[in-house]
């Protein structure tokens, strides 16, 4: 595996610094290197963008060519195999598409135009510069960073690593490689009652993203009542925790955080780990100072209505006649 999108630049990255350009490489340089090394697959991973703060969020796989023809043969099949492994909608709400409804496009059809790069090993027509080479593969927009809760999740390296693991599972299936024998758990821990309210945290209503992530919580993973792993949640308002390299079986959780009660009720859950899969958990804890809403008034029963005020069940009509005298 070769990583091609960056040189070894400084860390942390400082925009406008004198060594800023050490991070970036020209797309043509990347394409030439891919061709020269005769790679089996090329993947370029990104995040997508819509309007800031919008609820749009879904992945898109893009290969060089049209919707009906991949110009680097095998690219569309690679993307199609990868899609079902990458799809994740438990912790990251998706606004469209589905595990059985993929979003896989040829770049020329998707963007509506193309150009040709004349390389040392051939001419390559497409739209995306990073795909203008002869190696099959795709560009992946994994999520929308303009969906603000997803952006907060992406601040957690373990969440990002899980995206890479899901992509790797698709690669293994495509090439018929041996799958992993262990599994993973990824989850979130959030407040049971308090919603997050912030101008930079616009979430999809009625999803788990509405609840306040518990910064700094400690999540213990238990197997047969014994703590086997511990995860320290970061302070980036995502509530993410990840447990790696787990033997298949059933696991439970403990959450420790000052000002919060232990897990109870529906949140004291058991999760089953399976080989070569990631299992998901959404945990919620109640604050120790939580006070249930006070009932300010009661809905009293309707008073009994006297029978005389009820609507009649029968009406009787009688016709009367009269003689009137007209004057004049």
Region roles according to the model:
Residues 180, 188-214, 299-302:
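Structural motif
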Residues 44-52, 62-63, 98-179:
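Active-site-adjacent mobile loop/cap segments within catalytic or ligand-binding domains
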Residues 183-192, 283, 293-294:
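A short, amphipathic beta-strand motif
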Residues 1-57, 61-73:
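Catalytic-core regions of hydrolytic enzymes
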Residues 258-290:
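Structured interaction patches on ligand/partner-binding surfaces of diverse proteins
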Residues 208-215, 222-240:
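Short, acidic Ser/Thr/Gly-rich low-complexity loop/linker segments typical of extracellular
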Residues 288-328:
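Periplasmic peptidoglycan-binding/tethering modules of Gram-negative envelope proteins
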Residues 239, 249-259:
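A short, solvent-exposed beta-strand micro-motif common in secreted/extracellular proteins
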